[in-house]
């Protein structure tokens, strides 16, 4: 990295101050996310983006309840882009990516990471779903990377708000540590999803992922009032993802069947590997029971429309 950091001291101090028993690798990856966001701020890369996803939720809304591994964005004109003809939309997206990829290369170079602007190299870039979702990968080792995803057609229901994205060192008195390490981090200021939008997105993710990720349920479990979410808006959110997801009706019908059979919550993911906050396992299991009829209601509403 351009900033030569005593990683072992950093990880030890973070774990000591926050009382965490997680692997050093997870904390190191979290630091990389922070440094990448700081470079985004330095280069002004947030002007056309809206921040969303688990990293935003953890850092700015739930006081680092769990570690997140990716950086997820929506283009700020996505509501407009989704209404354009495919050819016009692709031209607009290409124009943005042609400018963004070289800047992302600068971010990687400044941190001693590996990235290629060659969009035909699928190791570094995947173009998904009719060229409306771009996934970039910045490698910090041979096979390990930070994923940066930009969705160009996400429909936003709530107006985004500007935030300063927090780092884990904002949650304890880290001045001495930062000075000792010579570590200077400028928080990334960017338009971001509101908590209401994140709740809708989490419900949508729970019902439209091919495989259930327990982290989505855990996030809703910790968000106060998430069980009072607007069912109609959740169904709309699912419907609006048709530009990205294929066979939505079959997918939702299958999820409804699993809910009715009490087979919906099977997941290979272990939330305890990512969770920072202490939580009551019985309460989490009870939450799954409470959210089941809400998820079924969303499915039924979607299938009726």
Walk through the language-model features, giving the residues of each:
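Glycine-rich beta-strand-to-loop/alpha-helix junction loops that act as flexible
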Residues: 51-55
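Structured mid-to-C-terminal alpha-helical surface segments
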Residues: 1-49, 59-65, 75-305
């Amino acid at each position: 990295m351009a900033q030569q950091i005593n990683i072992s001291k950093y990880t030890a101090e973070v774990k000591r101050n926050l009382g965490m028993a997680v692997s050093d690798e997870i904390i190191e990856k979290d630091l990389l996310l922070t440094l990448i966001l700081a470079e985004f701020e330095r280069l002004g890369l947030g002007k056309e983006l809206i921040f969303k996803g688990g990293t935003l939720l953890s850092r700015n809304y739930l006081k680092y309840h769990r570690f997140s591994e990716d950086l997820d964005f929506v283009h700020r004109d996505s509501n407009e882009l989704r209404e354009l003809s495919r050819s016009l939309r692709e031209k607009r997206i290409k124009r943005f990516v042609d400018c963004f990829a070289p800047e992302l290369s600068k971010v990687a170079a400044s941190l001693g990471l590996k990235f290629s602007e060659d969009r035909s190299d699928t190791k570094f870039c995947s173009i998904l779903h009719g060229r409306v979702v771009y996934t970039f990968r910045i490698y910090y080792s041979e096979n390990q990377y930070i994923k940066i995803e930009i969705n160009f057609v996400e429909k936003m229901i709530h107006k985004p708000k500007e935030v300063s994205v927090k780092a884990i060192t904002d949650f304890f008195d880290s001045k001495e540590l930062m000075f000792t390490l010579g570590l200077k981090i400028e928080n990334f200021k960017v338009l971001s999803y509101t908590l209401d939008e994140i709740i809708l997105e989490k419900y949508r993710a729970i019902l439209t992922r091919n495989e259930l990720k327990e982290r989505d349920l855990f996030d809703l479990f910790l968000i106060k009032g998430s069980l009072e979410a607007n069912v109609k808006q959740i169904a709309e959110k699912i419907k609006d993802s048709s530009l990205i997801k294929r066979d939505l009706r079959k997918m939702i019908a299958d999820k409804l069947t699993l809910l009715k059979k009490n087979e919906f919550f099977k997941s290979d993911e272990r939330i305890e590997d990512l969770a920072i906050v202490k939580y009551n396992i019985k309460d989490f299991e009870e939450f799954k029971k409470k959210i089941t009829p809400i998820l079924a209601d969303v499915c039924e509403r979607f299938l009726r429309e």
